[in-house]
């Protein structure tokens, strides 16, 4: 027999948890739980990869959640008022997949057999949009802890906005030792307690095991005490992992707590009842092997030599979720039909968009004025906020600095659950994951801000947002050495290049206030995460962007200046490509190049604003060639790393060192971001190209080093 847990091992099918003879229904439930344990062994074994032990230990918990507690409709997985389920310890994904299959979400037994295989719906960790019923992408430990808090904020905000008849659900989050060791869990749990978020039920799978071995190797936190200090309701239920009635009672107690989040501490035994792997690190992340599986199945009363065994009566037990969920949803639909609220606002909120015509409220900025793009965003947000019903904004202690202050909006709090202003505190990582949770909950379009350099603190959350196509908007400001005296610790250099390399993330760096308005419009209308990269310093509002940005920005790149004076005969001699605060420098440099100087002929330079590479790459070849014609030398000008610019440019004025502490204008000048220096580099590029064209045929088929003219530090 396996090593039994100290208190309550799984009762044999013939007995109830209290030792009394079990009813046929109880016997069927226990068989169902054991079938889930069997699937948790079979799928990783077939894949020769996967995490078995946690799924086995938590099978009774999953059974209680999906059959007794949670409100959901498998036939309509996106029903707005469903309870949300987040598996933060996403390595136990086979547990979730098994429940989605059994409960009728559309997964099949063949999908379970294809666990972790190319093209299957059952990936190694849960992925939003990959299979029905997966609320959010998890896997990197702790992310689900913070995303669940975001879902709790969304539920409270929407309940206050639209009423409890339409929004009345719980968020359940399962997390493990690893999740709670991660720093993001501290950030998120602290804020959840401060916000007094009820309807938020976390189950801590306290199994004392990590990959390296027992948690005592590196972890001795008093977890209940820690969460009590955060202001949570804590229920340490001990050894009841196999007692379904005790589990249900604990969950319902937690669900009744309305004024604070709840933590149920559950002592489980990873891999139980495996005779040799229970409570071992090997049970965490490896298939059990055929012999161990056979012995364990015999203990569980399953056919030892049959894989993926699901008897009809077990499938019928779990498929009761379909009519039960349909009845719950239809009752909700009746309430919705009789609701007298603002349906246009409801529809727009759940679509993550503005009301019809919202973009007509975008401000137009006066040419010639000086406006930092972070201040332009502030103006855009406040001009349109009332027409974007789901808009919620906040920052990591930089609300005013990053342009995300909603004038007149209440602070999100127990006293003002309708509050649209979230003060995340100095918790960038939690903010990022909470934004993803809000977006995937639905009904909320979150905007979150911090200094661009500190986007690094958010990076794991941003990556999951991009992977899962969460509709979130990041306001990352103070975007270059132009921020000034705070120096290189706060001056972003490599961030633009690294974030552009992230699949699924739109990175937009507007040249001035009018471009910023168009970027805000595109971000609100988007369906994926958008990062707005904005200046601290004032920038001139350009006449050229005022005329052309409304049609050009959404295409990612467009011609700002064909040639000073407007001449359009023949191709340009040179193309200057700029983003953000460097576009106006390029415009001024083009004017200098157009003027004949002593010993230098006039140069006809085109200026291109390229605010968003992702949008530009989405255009057809003809459009891209019309903006960046082939065969014309190109010089890119951007106050960040040169990495990646060889896609578009022959040379760059860029920064490949860390910055320096100095007033912003001085720092930009020292690093070469002046019209005079850009014009000088442009002439050097033209000279190099002409010299190259005179080489012999062998040299002509080669290319000069595109990086010869990169700036590497102060000039």
Question: Positions of the model-derived regions?
Answer:
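Glycine-rich phosphate/pyrophosphate-binding loops
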Residues: 73-74, 155-165, 440-457, 472, ...
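Thiamine diphosphate
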Residues: 117-129, 147, 157-168, 185-309, ...
